[in-house]
Amino acid sequence: MYLPGFKAIAKDLDTDVSSVSLSLSTFFIGISTGQLLYGPLLDKFGRKKPLYFGLTLFILSSLSCLFVTNIDQLIVIRFVQAIGCCAAAVAAVAMVRDLFTVKESPKVFASLMLVIAVSPMLAPTAGGYLIAALGWQSVFVFLGLMAFLMLLASIWWLPESYKPDPSYSLKPKPILTNFLTVLKEPGFYTYALVSAITFSGLFAYVSSSPIVFMDIYKVSETGYG
């Protein structure tokens, strides 16, 4: 959503657009890393408490983006923001498995994947108009507000779909054993490869397009969006 603001961010932080794009790369790294962390936490503490933590972290990091004074700070905060963000993604997948049967789950997952696939295409358009009207900081205010509303909705209306398992250990050895069990399954690599191929092109375009359109071709924020 902040992609149309890369040029404005670069100007305000006295850097170049390619350096700003590193904040997007670190966000993707944070998303990948965070999913490994939240899986065990969701089994140990239930679905809602880790979700509350992640959303709160996302809100605080989004608001912190308003006060950055250099690109290094933005890159680090975007990583933290990603760690908070992926709590919702992991919890959503876990809740689908809790609440739906094996036959129903594929339909629900298909709907989730549709949202995940469409949102990166629609977000720059909304972000372009926000940035043109209110500046690039407004995007992070908007994201923080959306996360705050999600947090309230989770507290008031979202039921706990999983009873926490007190015996589940957060020690590294059993967690790594579970990961190794998954890695030994041939089917895992098939699904992982398909997912990687599907999203790699999209993310490559998303990360490089601001440099091409805004830095080289001088396209405006709304025009890029």
Regions found by a protein language model. Name each.
Residues 77-118:
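Cytoplasmic helix-loop-helix junction between adjacent transmembrane helices
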Residues 61-66, 81, 97, 154:
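MFS-fold secondary transporters
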Residues 9-10, 41-42, 126-134, 214:
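Interfacial helix-cap and linker-helix signal at transmembrane-aqueous boundaries
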Residues 33-72:
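Conserved MFS/SLC helix-loop-helix module at the cytosolic interface between two early adjacent transmembrane helices
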Residues 69, 73, 111-156:
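Helix-loop-helix hairpin linking two adjacent transmembrane segments in secondary transporters
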Residues 1-17, 38, 205-210:
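Extracytoplasmic
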Residues 161-191:
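Juxtamembrane intracellular "pre-TM" segments in multi-pass secondary transporters
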